Structures are given as structure tokens and as C-alpha cells.
Swiss-Prot record:
Belongs to the vinculin/alpha-catenin family. Residues 928-938 have a biased composition (Basic residues). This is Catenin alpha-2. The keyword Cell membrane applies. Residues 912-927 have a biased composition (Basic and acidic residues). It comes from the Eukaryota. It is found in: Cell membrane; Cytoplasm; Cytoplasm, Cytoskeleton; Cell junction, Adherens junction. Interacts with CDH1 and CDH2. Interacts with ZNF639; recruits CTNNA2 to the nucleus. Interacts with F-actin. Pfam families: Vinculin (PF01044). GO terms for molecular function: actin filament binding; beta-catenin binding; cadherin binding; identical protein binding; structural constituent of cytoskeleton.
Length: 953
């Protein structure tokens, strides 16, 4: 960087013809086009037509001459105004004039005889020389603009030096005012230059430098003022020197970006996707080999070495302090699975050596290998999200504690809290780098690394500001300095948080947040029962923080979509959590803490607290379900934790006791997933028939706008619930227990009842008796099939717990469908009885599932449920159609009066809305190859280089 007294040095070779700005390119393009057209006039060789003068060539030659004259006039004006490059500009203008005259003569002779290859060659050489001369003139003019910018930078540097040398606060105020004025001028000139730069990297560097200059300007004044007021406090000098260095680096950044000499991202270590992600991508590419050329001695060591390198990186992440034990075990298991898959793949390659085509076993092994690496990626992403969820929670607390200690003037305490704050900052940086390591989003990774670097450099200065305040707690200047550094820290943490959120998946975030909130809810309940106030308060605070972060991120995510049914459902779920659930939870926490903190413990209703905690978990889970509504089956498969993680939240308590786990056993959904393949195949056949009926309903409701049409809304709701019920029979979906299936059946019955009322109102107003009778008949079917579905989902059971031994007997069996029936049982724990609502697996015969229930009984139950759902789906389709037909009859008879007060509004649905911004999954940020347009646009620079490359004639 230039000092305040050194002359301006341009880091740009004046002889270089590299075009660096869009303006030069735009100005050069018309001349290049005209010259190219002129040269190509007779490019096709001699013509069979009568020879003569080419009028078109003469016109083109005249246009080239006029364009050259325009460049000469502008160049002379720039040369007169320039102070630094006057001689070079004058020489360039004369060169353009000379080459322009040569071009005029050559083009005129060529126009008179366009078939002469000699004259054409002479004109091509003249055109090449003219273009080079004009390009050099424009580049020199561009250099003159850069010199003006550098002059502004020099003035700002001098003003900065003056601020640094201020001797008192009044002198500082005056000098800083002048510095501010020069800053405004520099920012204007730099912004113009930024818009003109061709290189995106240089534009980014210029924007970053301008932002840094603006960001540090406020800190510059307060840090300098604190140093002048308290020169005896060493921390004030450290603050001031840091800010001055930041401003100087920003000025140097503007200078380098303006001259296109900025250090590359590679030099700064900010470029590229994450190391672990890149290694996995490369490994996935390397496993695709040609059996004809496969050699075990060549490929086995290479692939095994690559895989072990990946596993080493995964092991480091697994061993990190914030990685949960269960996540660590899953990572280890996936690493072992990947190792085994590679050995299987290599064995298949050996079996296929020398073959032209890959056999089916080899293709299966490749698919398995790819799936295992994908599974490993998922576990690594979840591990990173564990870290993010914990570390980016209540990020301002360590800072606030540090500031409070500083305000009290307790320097010893400040040093202790400074260590905590430093560890917190280091953790943020570490976690941010972990997030980068597994991300494929190159631009996002760059932003995260830059933000993390800023956090790393700012942390010591925040501590210095706190030390200054601790040494002079009564000083307003020290307080102002602390406030400025506090604001800057909070802004930088927000930048880092948003950058990290951009390179991580919302689905992963919701999955991990849901699990963490469940952990915290369990901790809260245990702390409540043990009377541990501190743990209760701290954990409840973590729950509030996690919920607030879920709400913030999901609201921000929905801004990427146009308003519609999807966004309404998601925002409705977030609103319920923020406005209803969380206030109730906070109230119950306050009541519990007050009761436990009293000198004489006050009685309070534990179940109220437990229910409030349960609602928080349910609220987050509902948000996640709403967000996943538009995901594809492939995306949902990738989010397998939604299906596999078997977290149960009991209706009365979330505490998992040994008795609880003994009673719960496996979920009914898990048991359905363990059926024999023959039974699964039969269920799949029934599900396929059900899907055919579903497609009919989808086609019918897709026609209509559901705003103002509750019949369509109810049909969609019933369809969604029936899909969940059929998924349950395959061991999938959100319904875990058959108590969930019972509740789903109740919801369908309620929706069917509401649809019955609406459709009957339509039927009552229908003047056509035939249509009316059809509609009423279909409504009877809905009532019948709703009742049938309800029966298929229930079985009554009586459960007794005698001497710790479960005895289950079926009574009043209405169906053979297996169920988890909720009962309340007293669990005696230390003389204290607590009500636990427990899910008990039972079958029609009354025996516990897994200890005697027959697979055939479960198959019959599943097929009965699917059949009932299919029949109900068909009835809903017919009801929707009949309701529309009845409404049209009503309108035909009564005319426009009917439109004023319809029971439901039948309007065709508008075209489906798409996201304004496609949020790609991080792993999809790979290079895509697309077929280009057949029509090519040749840039002026390319055309110029082609002229340079042409041989002389």
C-alpha cells in the first residue's frame, strides 16, 4: 500500500492491451463490428457476377472512418484533462490518427477492387493496427480514470494519517470531519469503478473493501477518542491500532481491485468447496471404472487410500466435543459400511475384468457404493448441524456477561469472562469451518470463511474494549467505545450466522432442532421432578432459543416463495408456535421456577408444565411436516431421520423411564416394516390400487381454486390423512402408533361430517332432482366408509399390570387390526406416583404384539384399512364432481342471483406458483453442462485477438 507521502504508483503495465472494464468493451464493439464486416465483404472469393465497385464496401469504409474520428475527438479531450498520463494519451491519439489514415486509404482501395487478395491483405493489416491503436487509447483513458481514483485514495490516506496524529479530542473531531468528507467522495468514485469492472472477483473485492471502510469508520472515531482520553490504558492503543489497520487494508483493497491486482481467493484460502465434500465428490467419480481397463494393483490402493482419507476427516468430526453419542455411533457405522461397500465393489470389478459391458451385479455394487457415501454425507451433515444448533444458540450471552462485568469495574472477573468469550468466538469459527468442510456451495463457503476470519480478528478487540471499560467504568468515552465494538460484533455474528445458514439445508436444520428440543424437554421434566432450578431455567432458555431460531429461519425461508397454500400452512405453524405455544411454555417455566425457588416449596401442577413442553416439541414437528410437504420422494428419502429416528413423546410426560421403555417396545410402524416380503408385496398391491384412486382425486381437485371452496379443502385434507394411514401399513410415514391411526381416522370422520353438511347445503339448493339424489347417495357412501375406516383402526383392549408383568386381553373386538391403545398406569417411583400415558401394543387376540400375534392377522388388518381408504377416496371424488354439477344446475335455473350467495365458490385454479428463487440442496452445487445456443456472440476482445492471429497476405 502507498504511504501518505509517497507518489501514486500505478500497478498496471501501460503497454498491456488487457481490457478490464465494461465501458472500454462497449466503446470498442461498434468499431470491431464495422471492421469485421468490411473485411468479410469479399471473404467468399471471386464472384461470378460482373465486376465493378462495391457500394457496400465504400459505405462500410466511411463508417469506419467516422468511428475513428469520434475516437480521436474524445481522446484529445481526455488528454487535455489528464494530469498524470498526458504524454501517453497524446501519443496514443496520434497513433490512432496515423493508423486511421492508413486504414482509410487501404479500405478505399479495397472497396474499389474487392476481389484483390493483395488489397484485402493490406486492409486486414491496417485494420489490425487500427484496432490495436484504438484499444490502447481506450485503455489509457481507463488508466486515467484509475489514476483519479488513486488520487482520491491518497487524499483519504493523508486524512487518515491526520486523524491518527490528532493531539486532543477537539483536534480529533475536526480532522475526523474532514476525513468523513473525503470518505464520501472516495465511496462515490469507487462505486462507479466497481460497476465498470469486468472481473467478478475484482467487483467483489471492491465491494468488500468499500464495506470494510464504511464499517470501520465509526469505530475509528470512538477508538481514537478512547485512546486520547485514556492513554494510560494499554487496551485503548490496541483498539485504535486495530481499527487504523482495518481502514488501511480497506484502502489498499480498493486500490488493488481498481487495478485488478487483488490477491486471489486461492491466496487467501477462501476459495473452493469444502475439503470433505470435495473428497467425497472425487471419490464418487473415481469409483466409476471401465472393466476392460480395470487393474486391481492400480486401482485398489488408490481408492482405499482416498476412502481412508475421507474416513479420517469423518472421524475428526465424530470425535468433536459437540457431536452426540448416537450421532458418533452412526458416523462410525456408516464409515464401516462404506469400507465394506468398497470391498464388495472391487470384488465385482475383479469378476468383470476384461468385459466390454458391466454386468448387473457390478451395477448394483456401484449403486450400493454411491448410496453408502450418500448416507455418510447425511450423517456428517447432521453432525455439523448438531454443532451449529448448539454453538449458534444465544450467541450474544457471553458478550453481555463480559460487558456487565466490565461495567462493574471488576478487572479480574472481566479477564475470566474474556476467556469464556474467546472460547465462544473460537467455537463459532470452528463450527463455521466444519460447515464449510461438508458443503458443495462454493460461493457460500467463501462468504462463511470471510465472515469467520472477521470474527477471529474482531474478538481480541472486543475484549480490549471491555478491559478499557473495566479500567474506567465511569468514563462515557469508554462506554461509547464498548457499545461500538459490541454493535460491530453482533452484526458480524449475524453475518456469519446467515452465511452458515445459507450453506446448510433447512431440512437438516429442522430435523436436528426437533431432536435437540426433545432432548431439552426431557431434561426440563427431569430437572422439574428433581427440583433442580438452575438446570430447569438454563434448559428452558435453550428451548426458547431453539424455537426462536426455528421460527426466524423458516420465516426467512418462506420469503423465497410466492404466497400460496404451501407458505400459508408453514407460516400458520410458525405463528402458532410463536404466538400461542411459546408464551404458554414461558409462563409455565416461570410458575415452576417460582414454586421451586420459594423458601417453602409451593405445590404446582406438573402436568401443566409437561403438556406445555410437549406442545413446543409438537409445534416444531408440525413446522417440519409443513415444510416437507413439497419435497420429492427422493428428498424425503434423503431426510431419512424423519422415518427412522424413533422418538416418542408421551401425552402426559416426556420422561423415559425403564418401565416406559419396557412397555413401549417397538412402534407399530416399525413392526409393520418388519413384515415378511410376501406380506409386504400383498400390501404394496393394495397400495397401488389406492394410489390409482388418489390420482383421480388429485386430478379432480387440481382443477379448482380452494379459496372459497371448503369442499375442495376438505377433500385435500382427507386425501392427505388417508395417504398417511396407508403409508403406516408399509412401515413408513408420520404415524408411528396405531393410536395415531385412530386419531387420523377421527380426523377423517370429522372432515367427512363437515363435507356432508356443505354438500347437503348444495343439494338442498339444487333444483335438479336427479343431481340431488346422486349427490345425497355419494354422501351416504362417505358416511359409511368413514365409519368403516374408523372401525378398521380400532380394537378395544384391557391392560393390567400385575407385579410388574403385563397382561393384555382383548374385549369387544371390532376388527383384527392391531393397535397401540393408550392407557394410564401408575408408576411408583420412590413413593411418588406419576401418571404415564403408555402405548401398549395389542392384537385382536389380546396378546402383546411380537409375542404371539400372527402376520396374517396384521396383513388382513392392513389390507382392510387400505380397502376402506380406497373406497372413501372414490366416494370423495364422486362427491366433488356431483357437488360441482349440482352447483351448475342451481346457477342455470336461478341465474346471476345464485352467484351472489353460493354455498361454495367454483373457480378454476390459477397456474401453479413456483419459488422465486430455487433453493438448491448444498450437495447439488456442481458444475452443470448445458447445450449452448447455436448462435454465437463474438465479443470484441475475441474478434481483436483473431485479427492479431491472422497471417499477413
Amino acid at each position: 500500500m502507498t504511504s501518505a507521502t509517497s507518489p501514486i504508483i500505478l500497478k498496471w503495465d501501460p503497454k498491456s492491451l488487457e481490457i478490464r472494464t465494461l465501458t472500454v468493451e462497449r466503446l470498442l464493439e461498434p468499431l470491431v463490428t464495422q471492421v469485421t464486416t468490411l473485411v468479410n465483404t469479399s471473404n467468399k472469393g471471386p464472384s461470378g457476377k460482373k465486376k465493378g465497385r462495391s457500394k457496400k464496401a465504400h459505405v462500410l469504409a466511411a463508417s469506419v472512418e467516422q468511428a475513428t474520428q469520434n475516437f480521436l475527438e474524445k481522446g484529445e479531450q481526455i488528454a487535455k484533462e489528464s494530469q498524470d498520463l498526458k504524454e501517453e494519451l497524446v501519443a496514443a491519439v496520434e497513433d490512432v490518427r496515423k493508423q486511421g489514415e492508413t486504414m482509410r486509404i487501404a479500405s478505399s482501395e479495397f472497396a474499389d477492387d474487392p476481389c484483390s487478395s493483395v488489397k484485402r491483405g493490406t486492409m486486414v493489416r491496417a485494420a489490425r493496427a487500427l484496432l490495436s491503436a484504438v484499444t490502447r487509447l481506450l485503455i489509457l483513458a481507463d488508466m486515467a480514470d484509475v489514476m483519479r481514483l488513486l488520487s482520491h485514495l491518497k487524499i483519504v490516506e493523508e486524512a487518515l494519517e491526520a486523524v491518527k496524529n490528532a493531539t486532543n479530542e477537539q483536534d480529533l473531531a475536526n480532522r475526523f470531519k474532514e476525513f468523513g468528507k473525503e470518505m464520501v467522495k472516495l465511496n462515490y468514485v469507487a462505486a462507479r469503478r466497481q460497476q465498470e469492472l469486468k472481473d467478478p472477483h475484482c467487483r467483489d473485492e471492491m465491494a468488500a473493501a468499500r464495506g470494510a471502510l464504511k464499517k470501520n469508520a465509526t469505530m475509528l472515531y470512538t477508538a481514537s477518542q478512547a485512546f486520547l482520553r485514556h492513554p494510560d490504558v494499554a487496551a485503548t492503543r490496541a483498539n485504535r491500532d486495530y481499527v487504523f489497520k482495518q481502514v488501511q487494508e480497506a484502502i489498499a483493497g480498493i486500490s488493488n481491485a481498481a487495478q485488478a491486482t487483488s490477491p486471489t481467493d486461492e491466496a487467501k484460502g477462501h476459495t473452493g468447496i469444502g475439503e470433505l465434500a470435495a473428497a467425497l465428490n472425487e471419490f464418487d467419480n473415481k469409483i466409476i471404472l471401465d472393466p476392460m481397463t480395470f487393474s486391481e494393483a492400480r486401482f485398489r490402493p488408490s481408492l482405499e487410500e482416498r476412502l481412508e482419507s475421507i474416513i479420517s476427516g469423518a472421524a475428526l468430526m465424530a470425535d468433536s466435543s459437540c457431536t452426540r453419542d448416537d450421532r458418533r455411533e452412526r458416523i462410525v457405522a456408516e464409515c464401516n459400511a462404506v469400507r465394506q461397500a468398497l470391498q464388495d465393489l472391487l470384488s465385482e470389478y475383479m469378476n468383470n475384468t476384461g468385459r466390454k459391458e458391466k454386468g448387473d451385479p457390478l451395477n448394483i455394487a456401484i449403486d450400493k457404493m454411491t448410496k453408502k457415501t450418500r448416507d455418510l454425507r447425511r450423517q456428517l451433515r447432521k453432525a455439523v448441524m448438531d454443532h451449529i444448533s448448539d454453538s449458534f444458540l444465544e450467541t450474544n450471552v457471553p458478550l453481555l456477561v463480559l460487558i456487565e462485568a466490565a461495567k462493574s469495574g471488576n478487572e479480574k472477573e472481566v479477564k475470566e469472562y474474556a476467556q469464556v468469550f474467546r472460547e465462544h468466538a473460537n467455537k463459532l469459527v470452528e463450527v463455521a469451518n466444519l460447515a464449510c468442510s461438508i458443503s458443495n456451495n462454493e460461493e457460500g463457503v467463501k462468504l462463511v470463511r470471510m465472515a469467520a476470519t472477521q470474527i477471529d480478528s474482531l474478538c481480541p478487540q472486543v475484549i480490549n474494549a471491555a478491559l478499557t471499560l473495566a479500567a474506567r467504568p465511569q468514563s462515557k468515552v469508554a462506554q461509547d467505545n464498548m457499545d461500538v465494538f459490541k454493535d460491530q460484533w453482533e452484526k458480524q455474528v449475524r453475518v456469519l450466522t446467515e452465511a452458515v445458514d445459507d450453506i446448510t439445508s433447512v431440512d437438516d436444520f429442522l430435523s436436528v432442532s426437533e431432536n435437540h428440543i426433545l432432548e431439552d424437554v426431557n431434561k426440563c421434566v427431569i430437572a422439574l421432578q428433581e427440583g433442580d432450578v438452575d438446570t430447569l431455567d438454563r434448559t428452558a432458555g435453550a428451548i426458547r432459543g431453539r424455537a426462536a431460531r426455528v421460527i426466524h429461519i423458516i420465516n426467512a425461508e418462506m420469503e423465497n416463495y410466492e404466497a400460496g397454500v404451501y407458505t400459508e400452512k408453514v407460516l400458520e405453524a410458525t405463528k402458532l408456535l410463536s404466538e400461542t405455544v411459546m408464551p404458554r411454555f414461558a409462563e409455565q417455566v416461570e410458575v415452576a421456577i417460582e414454586a421451586l425457588s420459594a423458601n417453602v416449596p409451593q405445590p404446582f401442577e406438573e402436568n401443566e408444565f409437561i403438556d406445555a413442553s410437549r406442545l413446543v416439541y409438537d409445534g416444531v414437528r408440525d413446522i417440519r411436516k409443513a415444510v416437507l410437504m413439497i419435497r420429492t420422494p427422493e428428498e424425503l428419502e434423503d431426510d431419512s431421520d424423519f422415518e427412522q429416528e424413533d422418538y416418542d413423546v408421551r401425552s402426559r410426560t416426556s420422561v423415559q423411564t425403564e418401565d416406559d421403555q419396557l412397555i413401549a417396545g417397538q412402534s407399530a410402524r416399525a413392526i409393520m416394516a418388519q413384515l415378511p416380503q410376501e406380506e409386504k408385496a400383498k400390501i404394496a398391491e393394495q397400495v397401488e390400487i389406492f394410489h390409482q384412486e388418489k390420482s383421480k382425486l388429485d386430478a379432480e381437485v387440481a382443477k379448482w381454486d380452494d379459496s372459497g371452496n371448503d369442499i375442495i379443502v376438505l377433500a385435500k385434507q382427507m386425501c392427505m390423512i388417508m395417504m398417511e394411514m396407508t403409508d403406516f401399513t408399509r412401515g413408513k410415514g408420520p404415524l408411528k402408533n396405531t393410536s395415531d391411526v385412530i386419531n387420523a381416522a377421527k380426523k377423517i370422520a370429522e372432515a367427512g361430517s363437515r363435507m356432508d353438511k356443505l354438500a347437503r347445503a348444495v343439494a338442498d339448493q339444487c333444483p335438479d332432482s336427479a343431481c340431488k339424489q346422486d349427490l345425497l347417495a355419494y354422501l351416504q357412501r362417505i358416511a359409511l366408509y368413514c365409519h368403516q375406516l374408523n372401525i378398521c383402526s380400532k380394537v378395544k383392549a384391557e391392560v393390567q399390570n400385575l407385579g410388574g408383568e403385563l397382561i393384555v386381553s382383548g374385549t369387544g373386538v371390532q376388527s383384527t387390526f392391531t393397535t397401540f391403545y393408550e392407557v394410564d398406569c401408575d408408576v411408583i417411583d420412590g413413593g411418588r406416583a406419576s401418571q404415564l400415558s403408555t402405548h401398549l401394543p395389542t392384537c385382536a387376540e389380546g396378546a402383546p404384539i411380537g409375542s404371539g400375534s400372527s402376520d396374517s392377522s396384521m396383513l388382513d388388518s392392513a389390507t382392510s384399512l387400505i380397502q376402506a381408504a380406497k373406497n372413501l377416496m372414490n366416494a370423495v371424488v364422486l362427491t366433488v364432481k356431483a357437488s360441482y354439477v349440482a352447483s351448475t344446475k342451481y346457477q342455470k335455473v336461478y341465474g346471476t342471483a345464485a352467484v351472489n350467495s353460493p354455498v361454495v365458490s367454483w373457480k378454476m385454479k390459477a397456474p401453479e406458483k413456483k419459488p422465486l428463487v430455487k433453493r438448491e440442496k448444498p450437495e447439488e452445487f456442481q458444475t452443470r453442462v448445458r447445450r449452448g445456443s447455436q448462435k454465437k456472440h463474438i465479443s470484441p476482445v475475441q474478434a481483436l485477438s483473431e485479427f492479431k492471429a491472422m497471417d499477413s497476405f
